[in-house]
């Protein structure tokens, strides 16, 4: 019984699902049916008929026939095929062949979309034709007065166009011919060709307007301005030659002739109404003319510079040479008393060699001023470079003079430092004597002897002849280091001795109470009397710290307070 019920329920479910799926297919069929009816109801035929009233020919007639044929094919062939597909889909759905029905509907949907695309193309092309016909009429209304205005401008300014006037006249006639061709195409109904023609004509007129506007200036520059400028450069060249300026090396004469020939060729090109690249070439020539003027101006400035500065240049070389010679004599005298470092002497001799080179260059400069082989600009560069070198030589010479002057200064400073170090050793000796300590350890006397010996070495070096300041500085440095170390060791020794006395005195309060302490303090006192202050301090400090921890620190602090 349960099985039967299950089977019945399964059948009901299957039927229900089938009915639902079939209902969906029916809905899709209805949708495509409405879509098809909507397409059939559109006024495409009416849109096509709008141009039927026009007098058509040529490509426009071909387009009309093509659009008409496309629409008729859609109405008579493609849409009826859609109807058949819809019947097939319903039939498949009635038989519950859902997959086939869906495939048929999918194919039908694609065909309807393709039809929509075709209709859209037809309507767009129709609209393009109608709008182009209107647009071309509007543009012709603008073109005609433009051509008249261009003719008027040409007529009133013929002299500005020279022989090229014929070219411009001919071009305007061609525009009139193209307008007539446009009218013929319109009258015969070939609107598409007429529109294409008017668009081309519009672009040509725009280019022609620009050419007419630019042409007078280009012609004037090519025929008048630049030839005149080149003649002026030639005249300037000749005048500068007569005045003694060196301009031959520029080679401008040949270059100007080349440009004059180039301008003649450009004039022939312009007379044909062709200004292609002419402006660019004229700009290049004009730029080169500017460069020529700058070069000639530079040569004139250079000549004036040389006339004014060469006497000053000669004087500067003579002065630096005389200064060098004076310093050389001074150095020779100085070397009798002092040793001058080889590096310093090499730098000094290099200055002399450079001065000799400048003298030779000056002789060569005078020759070149007379032989007319080098331009004044090149000679100016030589003189300017020479002035720079003289300035450098003056700086180097001044540095060298300071270095040799420092020899005497360094000697005096060394002697003063030696006196100061001797005074320090004397004061240290007095300090030891006033300290009332039992005696001085041997290593302290060794330090004293070393410091004294180092001072003696400074004296010996100072007495050398010629005096070597580098050796003096080295000996002085070693002596100072020895004195500083002696000073440091004496201060440490005295501090240790004073602190040891303070510790022993402080520990005496416990001496009678602590037998062990008494023995340790006696050892510390023995070491103290034998000048072994560091060991004595260690013994005394250790002994008092065992009795009273922290006592050493308090004693040290008290001693620091007293020293202040």
Curated annotation (Swiss-Prot):
Family statement drawn from the similarity comment of this UniProt entry: Belongs to the EzrA family.
Chief location: membrane
Positions on the Cytoplasmic side per record topology: 22-564
Coiled-coil parts of chain: 101-140, 168-215, 251-436, 468-537
Function according to Swiss-Prot or TrEMBL: Negative regulator of FtsZ ring formation; modulates the frequency and position of FtsZ ring formation. Inhibits FtsZ ring formation at polar sites. Interacts either with FtsZ or with one of its binding partners to promote depolymerization.
Gene encoding the protein: ezrA
Keyword Membrane: yes
Protein name, entry field: Septation ring formation regulator EzrA
Keywords: Cell cycle, Cell division, Cell membrane, Coiled coil, Membrane, Septation, Transmembrane, Transmembrane helix
């Amino acid at each position: 019984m349960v099985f039967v019920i299950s089977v019945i329920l399964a059948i009901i479910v299957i039927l229900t699902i089938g009915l639902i799926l079939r209902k969906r297919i029916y809905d899709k069929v209805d949708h495509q049916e409405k879509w098809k009816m909507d397409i059939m109801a559109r006024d495409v035929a009416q849109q096509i008929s709008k141009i039927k009233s026009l007098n058509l020919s040529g490509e426009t007639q071909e387009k009309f026939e093509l659009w008409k044929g496309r629409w008729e094919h859609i109405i008579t062939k493609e849409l009826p095929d859609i109807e058949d597909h819809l019947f097939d889909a319903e039939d498949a759905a009635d038989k519950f062949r859902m997959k086939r029905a869906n495939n048929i509907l999918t194919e039908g949907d694609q065909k309807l979309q393709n039809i929509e695309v075709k209709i859209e193309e037809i309507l767009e092309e129709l609209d393009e034709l109608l709008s182009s016909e209107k647009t071309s009429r509007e543009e012709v209304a603008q073109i005609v007065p433009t051509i008249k205005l261009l003719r008027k401008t040409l007529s009133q300014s013929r002299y500005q166009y020279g022989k090229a006037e014929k070219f411009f006249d001919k071009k305007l006639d061609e525009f009139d011919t193209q307008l007539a061709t446009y009218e013929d195409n319109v009258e015969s109904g070939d609107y598409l060709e007429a529109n294409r023609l008017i668009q081309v004509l519009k672009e040509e007129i725009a280019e022609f307007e620009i050419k007419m506007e630019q042409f007078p200036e280009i012609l004037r520059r090519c025929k008048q301005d630049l030839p005149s400028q080149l003649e002026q450069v030639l005249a300037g060249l000749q005048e500068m030659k007569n005045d003694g300026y060196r301009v031959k090396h520029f080679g401008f004469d040949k270059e100007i002739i080349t440009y004059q020939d180039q301008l003649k060729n450009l004039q022939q090109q312009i007379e044909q109404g062709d200004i292609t690249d002419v402006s660019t070439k004229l700009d290049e020539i004009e730029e080169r003319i500017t460069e020529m003027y700058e070069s000639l101006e530079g040569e004139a400035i250079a000549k004036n510079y040389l006339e004014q500065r060469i006497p000053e240049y000669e004087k500067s070389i003579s002065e630096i040479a005389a200064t060098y010679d004076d310093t050389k004599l001074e150095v020779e005298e100085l070397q009798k008393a002092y040793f001058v470092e080889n590096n310093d002497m090499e730098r000094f001799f290099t200055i002399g060699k450079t001065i000799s080179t400048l003298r030779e260059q000056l002789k060569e400069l005078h020759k070149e001023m007379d032989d007319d082989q080098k331009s004044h600009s090149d000679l100016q560069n030589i003189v300017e470079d020479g002035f720079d070198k003289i300035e450098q030589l003056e700086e180097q010479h001044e540095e060298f003079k300071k270095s040799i002057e420092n020899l005497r200064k360094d000697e005096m400073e060394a002697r003063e430092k030696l006196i100061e170090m001797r005074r320090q050793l004397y004061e240290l000796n007095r300090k030891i004597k006033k300290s009332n300590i039992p005696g001085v350890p041997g290593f302290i006397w060794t330090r004293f002897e070393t410091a004294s010996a180092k001072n003696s070495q400074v004296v010996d070096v100072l007495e050398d002849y010629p005096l070597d300041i580098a050796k003096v500085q080295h000996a002085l440095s070693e002596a100072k280091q020895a004195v500083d170390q002696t000073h440091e060791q004496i201060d440490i020794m005295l501090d240790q001795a004073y602190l040891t006395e303070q510790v022993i005195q402080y520990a005496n309060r416990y001496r009678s109470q602590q037998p062990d302490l008494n023995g340790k303090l006696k050892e510390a006192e023995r070491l103290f009397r034998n000048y072994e202050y560091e060991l004595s301090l260690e013994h005394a400090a250790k002994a008092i710290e065992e009795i009273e921890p922290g006592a050493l620190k308090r004693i040290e602090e008290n001693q620091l307070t007293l020293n202040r």
